C-alpha cells in the first residue's frame, strides 16, 4: 500500500489583471511540480486574476476572464494527472466569493469559498467579497457553459468540504483563516484530514516573517498533519510587496522553505512525506483523539486518484530543515529592491531619477537601487532568462548582458544633486562620492537662478521681498523661502526625468524616486509637492532608525565607504542660510523631537491605537526614568499638534513601499480626517489635569472648554 506522497506548493509573481502572464506562470508552476513527481499542486490566493485587483473585482470582466483562464488550464495537457488547486473570484447566486477551484483531469472536484475575510490594515476583502458562512455545507454550483463544454459537468460542489483520495484526505483553508481564533484546520484535522492547504496573499512587514512560520508549525505540532502554504510574491500593482515564503510542514517541523525575496517569477517547492508519520504522530496525542472522537464530519468529495504509488518503499523522503530568517537590514536591502524591479520592468520606463542630497534618506534609496542591480546581475548569472529579457528591454539593447552592478546602475539610475546658496560643500561632496561608488550617472546643478526668477515674479507683483529669519524675516517669510526651493527641486526632478536620457541620445523616460521616510511623513516634516512628491518612494514605509542601520549595513555589504561620512553628518534640509559656511539647520531641531521619539509616537498612535491622552498615560510609565510628567505632556502635545496640522499632506503622499505597521499612508492603510482642531482642547485638558494631579495640584474643570 502506498503511503509516501509528493506535494507541491509555490510562490508566483502574479500581476493584477495580467491574465495572459498569470496563466503562463501558473502553467509553468504546474509543469515544474509534475516534473518533480508531485501529485498535488497548490497556488497562491486569487492567482488567476492577481490578488490586487481591488475594485476591479466588481467588474463582470474580471469574473469572465478568470473563467476563461480556468478553461485554458483545465484543457491544457500540462494539468493532466495532477490535482490542481487554483484561486479566482466566483459568483454564486449573485454573490461574489474568493474561491479555490480544485480540478483533476478535466473535471472540477470542488469550489471552496473563503470563510474568513481579511479586512484590517491594507486588506479590504469585505468590500468585494462575502464570506461563506455555512460550515460543513455544500451546494450545487452551475458551471458556465464554457467550462461545461470542457468538463461535461453541469454542476459541481460549492462550499465547505474536503477531498478524499484513495490514500488520504485533503482540506483547504485560505490565508486569513489560518489567523482566526477558530481556524478550519482545527476541525478538519480532528475529522481525519491529513493534508491541509493554505493559499495566501500575504505582504511583507519588517520583522514579521516568523509569524506565519510559527503559526504553521504550531498548527501541525498540536494536531499533526501536513501543511502546505502558497503565497504571492512581488509587486502586483501597488504599494505592497508579497514576500513569498511558501512552505511545507509536517508534525511541527518545516520540510521546505521558499525564498522571501527573489526575482524569480515562479518558485515551486516540493516535498515527499510519509502519511504514516502523520498517523503515528496523532496516535499518541490522547487529548487530540478524544476531541476527534466527537468531531462533526465534513462533506467528502470522493476523488478517483492517489497521491502515492504502490511501489514507493524505496522512495527517499524529505528531511526537516531549520527556517532561515533575514535580519531587518537584509529585509530592507532585498524587499524594496525587488519591489522597485517589478515596478520598473512593468512600467516600461528606462530607469530611475533620484534627487541625491547627500543625506541618509536619499543615500538609502540609492543603496536600494544598487541592491536591485546586484540582484539582477546575480539572477542573470543564475540563468534567469526572464530577468535578462527584462533588462535588455529596459536599457533598449538586445545584446546587453549585465555582469557588473555598477555598470547596470550607470545605465538605469540618474542621480541629481540640486544645490542652492544654502547648500554646503560637504553634502555636494558626499552625494558625488556615493554616486561614483554605485556607478550612477550623476548630475550637479544649481537652482538659485530658478529661485531668483520665481521670487522676482512675486516681488514684481506685490512689491515685497521676503527675508529668511536669519536676515530678520518672520517665520512665515522664512518658511515660504524654504518651500520655494523645495518645490523648484521637484519641478526640475520631473524635467530631468523626462528629458535627461533624450539629451544623451538614449531612448525612454525615468521614474522619479522620493526619499521621505515614514517618521517624517507621520509628522508632516516635508514640503507638499517638493522632492517627497515623486512617482514612487521605496523608503516611505521605513523609519529613520532602521534606515540608518541599513546604511551602516550597506557599507560592508556593498563596499560603499562614502556612506560613512553620510552617517556621521547631522540630518539637515539645507533650506536656510549657512552660518559661516556651516549648516545652521538640523531636522531634529526643526521638528522639536528626535527620530527615536517619532518612532515611538508612530507605533503608539497606529499599532496601539492611542489618542493623545492614552499616549500620555503610556509614556508616563515608559519614560518615567528620563522625563517628568510635565515633559511627557509637552512632548505628546507637540507631536499631536504638528501631526494634525500636517495631516493634509498625507492625502498627496507619494505611493510608498509598505514596510511598517505604523505607516500614515492615507490611501487605505491609515484612514483619518485631514482637517483637525489642532489645539485638541478636550484631550489636552485631560492631560493637563493628570499632570496637575501628579504635581499635587487641583485639577481644572472640563466645563466650558472652548
From Swiss-Prot:
The EC number(s) this enzyme carries: 6.3.5.1
Keywords: ATP-binding, Disease variant, Ligase, NAD, Nucleotide-binding
Keyword Metal-binding assigned: no
GO terms under biological process: 'de novo' NAD biosynthetic process from L-tryptophan; NAD biosynthetic process
Catalysed conversion reaction: deamido-NAD(+) + L-glutamine + ATP + H2O = L-glutamate + AMP + diphosphate + NAD(+) + H(+)
Matches recorded under PROSITE patterns: CN_HYDROLASE
Biological pathway: Cofactor biosynthesis; NAD(+) biosynthesis; NAD(+) from deamido-NAD(+) (L-Gln route): step 1/1
Molecular function via GO: ATP binding; glutaminase activity; NAD+ synthase (glutamine-hydrolyzing) activity
Domain CN hydrolase, chain residue ranges per copy: 5-275
GO cellular component, one term: cytosol
Active site: 45, 114, 175, 357
Keyword ATP-binding: yes
Residues at which ATP binds: 355-362
Source domain of life: Eukaryota
Pfam families: CN_hydrolase (PF00795), NAD_synthase (PF02540)
Residue ranges of the region described as Ligase: 325-706
InterPro entries linked to this entry: C-N_Hydrolase (IPR003010), C-N_Hydrolase_sf (IPR036526), Gln-dep_NAD_synthase (IPR014445), NAD/GMP_synthase (IPR022310), NAD_synthase (IPR003694), Rossmann-like_a/b/a_fold (IPR014729)
Effect of residue 49 to R: In VCRL3; loss of protein expression
Its biological purpose: Catalyzes the final step of the nicotinamide adenine dinucleotide (NAD) de novo synthesis pathway, the ATP-dependent amidation of deamido-NAD using L-glutamine as a nitrogen source.
Disease listed for this protein: Vertebral, cardiac, renal, and limb defects syndrome 3: An autosomal recessive, lethal disorder characterized by severe cardiac and renal anomalies, including hypoplastic or absent left ventricle, transposition of the great arteries, absent pulmonary trunk, and hypoplastic or absent kidneys. Patients also exhibit vertebral segmentation defects and shortening of the proximal long bones or micromelia. Death occurs in early infancy.
Oligomeric and partner information: Homohexamer.
Sequence similarity: In the C-terminal section; belongs to the NAD synthetase family.
Name by which UniProt lists this protein: Glutamine-dependent NAD(+) synthetase
Source organism (scientific name): Homo sapiens (Human)
